[in-house]
Amino acid sequence: MRHPTLIAAFLFGISSLCSGQTLVEAIEQTLLTNPNIQSSAYNVDAADALRRQAVAGYLPSIDLVLARGLEKSDNTTTRATGDANRNFDRFERSITLNQMLYDGFSTAAFVKQQEAVLSATTQRLATTLENTALRSAQAYLEVLRRDQVVALAQVNLTQHDETLLKIEERFESGVGTKVDVVQTKGRRAQSKSSVLLSEKDAQNGRVEFYRVVGESPRELSLPVRPKGLPETLEQAVQLAFRNNPQVKAAQFDLEASQSARKQLLGGYHPRVDLALGATRNDDMDGSPGANDDETAVIKMSYNLYRGGADRAKMKEAIARINGAEQALIALRRSITQDVSILWNDLEDLSIRIEYLQLHVTSTEEALAVYLEQLAIGRRTLLDVLDIQNELFRARSGLVSAEFQLRLAEYRLLATGGQFLGSMGLTNQRAALTRR
C-alpha cells in the first residue's frame, strides 16, 4: 500500500536513531506510524474514488453484448416458408455507446458535491494530524518535566543525607539531641518517598511516550518557544475560524449539502442522451441469415411522476443544509470557547510563573542567609533543612508551570490549525491539502 509514502510526503524524514531526539523528530515518528492517521488517509482515498465516480458521469458508457444459442421459432416468418417449427443457431453481437448530453446539471452538481466531500475528508485528516502531533508534544514535554522533577528530588534527598550525617555526628559528640536525629530521619524518609514517587511518574511518562510516539524517548531536549503565537484574543479567534481544519471540514460539509440539493433539482429537467449502436445478428426470430443494424439516436426522457419521492428528497436535502449550517455555528462557538480558555490559561500561567520565579529567587536568598547564620550559631541544621525543602517545592512548582505554559502555547496553535506549521512542517501540510 502507498500510505506510508503518502504520510512521508509531508514529513522531513526520520533522523538517525543513534542521536538525540528533538520534538520535531518525535512528531515525525508519531505521524508516520499512528494508525488513526493511516485510517484517515484511507478515508481520503475512498472520498477521492467517489469523486472519480462522479466525474465518470460526463463520459460515455460503452457496452458490448455477445450471445449464442439455439432458437426454435413458430411465427409468421417460419409459417410462410411451410416450416412452422424451425430450429436456428442464433448468434447476436452488438455494441452501444450512450453519451449524456443534458441532465439538468445533475452531474455537475454531483461532481461538486463529491469534491466538497473529498475536501472535508482531507481536512479531517489534517485535524487528526494536528491532534496527534499535539499528543506527541504533550508526551515529549511530560518526559522532560518529570525528569526534571526527579533531578530536583534527588538533589533534595542528597541534602537530607548530608544534613542527617552532620546531625548524627553532633549527637555522637554530645552537642546535638536525639530528637534532632529522629526528626531528620523522618524528613529524610519523606524525601526518599518523593524520589521514588517522581521516578515512578517519570517511568510512566516514558510508557506514555512509547504509546503515542511508537518508540522510547532518547536524550530529549527542551524545545524553543513556538513562533507565530497570536498577539490578542481576537486575533487568536479569527485565526482559528480561518485555519482550524475542523471549521474547514464543516464548511465543506455545508458545501456538499448545498450541491446535493442542486443535484436533485436536475430531476425536474428532462434528460437528453446520444445513443449510437451497431448489431450483427444471424438467424434471429425465424429469419435465416444476417440481420444487421446501425443506429444513431438522440433520446429524451422526462419523468412525470415518481410518487412524491422528488419532493421528499428535496425536503431532506434542505434539512441537511440547515443541519450543516447549525453544526458550523455550534463548532465556531466551541472554538471561541476553547480559544478563550486557552488564552486565559496563557495569561494566568505567565503571571504565575513570574511569582513562582520570585518565590524561587527569594527562597534561594533566604537559604544563603540561613547558611551564614548557621556558621555563627544563629540557625540550626534543621532550620536549613526546612528552607531547603521549601526551595525544592518552589523549584518543582516553577518547573511544572513552565511546562504547562509551553503546552498551552502548543494547544493554542493547534486550535488555530498552526501547530504543525510552527514545527516547520508547513510545506508537508500544504502537500496534503493539495492532494
Please provide the spans of the model-predicted regions.
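Bacterial N-terminal signal peptides that target proteins for export
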Residues: 1-7
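Membrane-embedded beta-strand positions in outer-membrane beta-barrel channels/transporters
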Residues: 27, 94-96, 140, 297-299, ...
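Periplasmic alpha-helical coiled-coil/stalk elements that build and connect Gram-negative outer-membrane
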Residues: 128-242, 253, 342-345, 349, ...
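A short glycine-centered flexible hinge/capping loop motif at secondary-structure junctions
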Residues: 171-175, 374-378, 415
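Transmembrane beta-barrel architecture of outer-membrane proteins
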Residues: 90-92, 138, 183, 271, ...
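Small/polar (Gly/Ser/Thr/Ala-rich) solvent-exposed segments
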Residues: 38, 61-83, 87-88, 98-127, ...
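Bacterial Sec-pathway N-terminal export signals of envelope proteins
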Residues: 11, 18-67, 73, 100-101, ...
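Acidic, low-complexity, intrinsically disordered peripheral segments
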Residues: 7, 397-435
